[in-house]
Amino acid sequence: MVTEIRSLKQLEEIFSAKKNVIVDFWAAWCGPCKLTSPEFQKAADEFSDAQFVKVNVDDHTDIAAAYNITSLPTIVVFENGVEKKRAIGFMPKTKIIDLFNN
């Protein structure tokens, strides 16, 4: 399951509640984001070791700024609320899961 983030507070609450969180920062106008979105959903459906969330950077510029998002799509892996890894650009499901595992 993928959760659509509605506020910075909601994202921070998820970080407090979940050890592992994978965030997809995206925008509706972004072509590679449109390709990544179904892959991110597939990864979430198959991988239960992390909470998967999406942040629309156009709707939540404050969150994008807080996490220094400058390119899209950006997928960030957090552990206990701390950024561990970051990848930019289109990613297939297997690469998203590998980003978390490696």
Swiss-Prot record:
Q: What CDD domains has UniProt attached to this entry?
A: TRX_family (cd02947)
Instruction: Alphabetically list the UniProt keywords.
Output: Disulfide bond, Electron transport, Redox-active center, Transport
Pfam families the UniProt entry points to: Thioredoxin (PF00085)
Taken from the UniProt record, the cysteine pairs bridged by disulfide bonds within this chain are: 30-33
| A molecular function (GO) term | protein-disulfide reductase activity
Q: Which domain of life is it from?
A: Bacteria
Domain (Thioredoxin): give its ranges: 2-102
InterPro entries, alphabetically? Thioredoxin, Thioredoxin-like_sf, Thioredoxin_CS, Thioredoxin_domain
Q: Name one GO biological process term.
A: cell redox homeostasis
Q: What does this protein do?
A: Participates in various redox reactions through the reversible oxidation of its active center dithiol to a disulfide and catalyzes dithiol-disulfide exchange reactions.
Give the UniProt family note.
Belongs to the thioredoxin family.
Name the PANTHER family on file: GEO12009P1
Q: What is this protein called?
A: Thioredoxin
> What species is given as this protein's source?
Mycoplasma genitalium (strain ATCC 33530 / DSM 19775 / NCTC 10195 / G37) (Mycoplasmoides genitalium)
Q: Which gene encodes it?
A: trxA
